[in-house]
Amino acid sequence: MQPPLFKIRQHGYFGFINSEGKTVIEPQYLEAGEFRNGFTTVRLNGLLALMDALGRLYIKRLYRAVGPFSEGLARVQVAQLWGFVDERGNEVIAPLFEHVGDFCEGLAPATFEGRAGFIRPDGQFSVQPVFSQTGNFSEGLAPAGHDGLWGFVDKTGAYHIAPQWDGASTFQEQSALVTRDGHWGLCNRAGEETVPPQFEFVKGHAQGEFFDGMALAFRAGKYGFVSQDGRVAVEPMFDLAGDFGGGLALVEINGAYGYIDREGKLAIMPKFEDAGVFSDGLAQVCADGRWGYINPDGQIAIPPAFQSAAPFRDGLALTVLDGKWQYINLRGEVVWRES
């Protein structure tokens, strides 16, 4: 597994440091993505090039869009069509498809001439394109739409769960999001609706996506949570809520922000002007216009001093002080600062 790298900014250019704050890739790019699975993208002449953790560019061809590597392959877009490259930058599946997803369990959803199926790593269809749209496999099942209705197919392309919903998403362990009449709920792997569609779609939210085993749910103007085992764990009652992390989730009550536990009980009283998700044991909070970090007991771990603060990731967090980027560690020590 590749050690984590963190994006830095210097004089308007982007590069990367390691967790000790040492520069690994010098700031030299006007645009750079985040590293995922050992690779990122940088923009060259208006198009994207792959770059590995050593700073090596794979420029056999530049692309309009590049997806993350999954099972050794990354989707890439040339003009309007998609194909795949391997971890050496070789184009192993030619850009022939109108749409593709990531490889999961040896197959990737792919659309060819308006119909969707599943391809193997050699680019050939394992499940012929007979569907209107398809999603990723998870433990042997994938969402697939046909004649306006969605169900779930196995790796032979046969429906394991009959088409019956207006939409469906990839299973996350035992639950998958399904939609009917503009609302979403959950079904299990037997096709039973464990949470009948009742929640509204909210722009900017990851509908039905589980974090720490819980997913945000919005109904009648209030936020609650559904659990990954297929139940409404916290009835919608909050003006605003954020994703779970470390067993706690941000909620807004009467204009102030605090945190609840998995049962919906207040664990940290609402007293902050703004707040974020718990990660690496700390969450960013805003008090008197400045950002700092608290621990799960609600105690200040890093005093509010920053103009902005991001969640911790792999032991570091990006903060802004006096308009400059800087990374701090879990003790609040600055390991790198923009000059």
Q: Which residue ranges define each predicted feature?
A:
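Residue-level detector of conserved, function-critical positions
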Residues: M1-S339
